[in-house]
Amino acid sequence: MSLARLATGQTGCAPGATEEPIVLVPLYPEQLGGMPTPRTGETLCGGTGADVLDGRLRLIAPETGKDVTEFHVKGARHTLEIAQIIGAQCAYLKAGSPSCDRDGVTGELLRRAGIEVIRVP
């Protein structure tokens, strides 16, 4: 995922090409939360990142059966902290990730904080 901030300090995000300089900050929320790379292959089955954040859904690593919810939530919180520090106005998130999708844990937390989330393939 990448957080983006217009270098001019203007608000809003323009998808695609722009004449305004953009600062991209690449992040890996799961890694920020303490997970190794590569990580386990958990998915959001039967819910969304909102369900995880609200305590209605847990993320279980299929390879080990371990609950890895705390890593995703912790990573999302660290990502939000960084986004707020740099004044990010939008985030480009990888589609299909339980964390880095618009409907994933990080995507949902960023949207709740008013940061525009753009899903990329």
Predicted segments with their positions:
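Short, surface-exposed acidic-centric catalytic microdomains
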Residues: 6-62
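Catalytic phosphate/metal-binding cores of nucleic-acid and nucleotide-processing enzymes, i.e., regions
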Residues: 4-10, 89, 113
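Short, well-ordered beta-to-alpha junction loops that form the rim of enzyme active sites
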Residues: 94-98
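Divalent-metal-activated hydrolytic enzyme cores
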Residues: 32, 50, 54-77, 104-121
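Short, charged beta->alpha transition segments
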Residues: 76-84
